Every structure is written in C-alpha cells, then in structure tokens.
Amino acid sequence: MRNREKDAAEMAERRARLLEAGFRLFAARSIEAVTLTEIAAEAGVGIVTLYRYFKTKPDLVIELGTRKWAEYYAEVEKAYAARGGERMDAAAEMDFFLDSVIELYRSHRDLLRFNRNFDAYVIHEECTAGQMRPYNEAVHVFARKFHTVYRKAKADGTLDTSIPERRLFVNTLYAFLSVAGKYAEGLLYPPDGPQDLTDELLLLKRIFLGAIVRRPS
C-alpha cells in the first residue's frame, strides 16, 4: 500500500512538473511555437514519459488552462471574502472584480499571456466540446459570479441594469481582461515605453465604473 501511495504521489508531482514546464514556455513564447519535446526537456524527463501523461499537445494545453484558472479563482474567492464578500453592494462587487483583473496583471502576467494565445490555439486545433468541458467549467464560474452581481444590482440599483447582462459582462469584465492581456504582452505600448501599466488599468477602471455605477443623488 505504501508503494502504491508513493507511486501516486510521484506521478502527481511529475504531472505538475510537466504542466509548469509547459506553462513557462507557452507564456514566454506562444503555445503554437512550443513542442512537446521542448516541454519534456524543460521538465527534465524524456518525451516517452510525457506521453504517458498527455497523449496530445491539446490535452496538455487544456488541462493546464483548467488548472491555472481554477488556481486563480481560488485566489479571487479568498480576496472576495477579505473584502466583505456578499455584504458588498453590486457596485462594490464590480469594483472588486475589476481590481481582481488588475491584480492578475500585477502578479500573473504569464497567465494573461497564456490566455491570450489559448483561444486561438484550441480553435485552430478544432478541440471538441468534450475536450473543452473541464476548461469551460473552470472559467464559467466567473460568468456565474457576474450573474450574481447583476441580480444584486437589479435589487439595490447601484449598477445600470438597463444594459442587458451579457452586454454589460462583455463590455466591462471581458473587455478589461482583454486590455490587461494586451498590456501583459506589450501590444499597446512600444517596447521602450512604460513596463508597468497598472496606472492605465486603474484609469480604465474609473472610466468603466463612472459609466455604470448608479448612486442615490
């Protein structure tokens, strides 16, 4: 029994090492540019070992995306509770979720760079709905969170709910995440421009909130 437990622990550690090696390479270059052979070398194992864990590159990419967003969501939940959680009104929750994207830019630019490349890769590879299900479940929790905020706004009136829910989601959190991703990749400023664009995201947050927050006069 002890050997079985040890084997399982070693397999889990090796799998995690392969995923982290892939993440480093994907974030530094792009998903398309990195081969499985390079990932195996980065992880310090042979390619045959890698194939024991991941039959195809999309398998590795999707599991990696699923794991990274689940880890980030756990961070968001912890910060959400520290900020007041469900005691916040809808406007305060929207402020929090925009701040969570800013924190993602500050602390996890590698995830933003990976994410910017992920969608194009899985479309190009024609990944099936079955393959994508774990990933979609991992990221859909953010949309469910927004749905809760929108319902709260309907009740407390602190956000402009004359804007349909999906439209508001796409044009606030989704758009904000997209801009943060472009900043992380250095796409919106020249290479010799500012390296930390947190202030630009804070400005954009103020613009977004100014357009949708409703306070009693």
For each feature predicted by the language model, list its residue ranges.
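Generic hydrophobic, amphipathic alpha-helix propensity
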Residues: 11-23, 39, 64-68, 72, ...
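Helix-turn-helix
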Residues: 17, 25-63, 67
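All-alpha amphipathic helical-bundle segments outside canonical DNA-binding/catalytic cores
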Residues: 92, 137-139, 155-173, 199
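Short secondary-structure transition hinges
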Residues: 103-147, 166-167
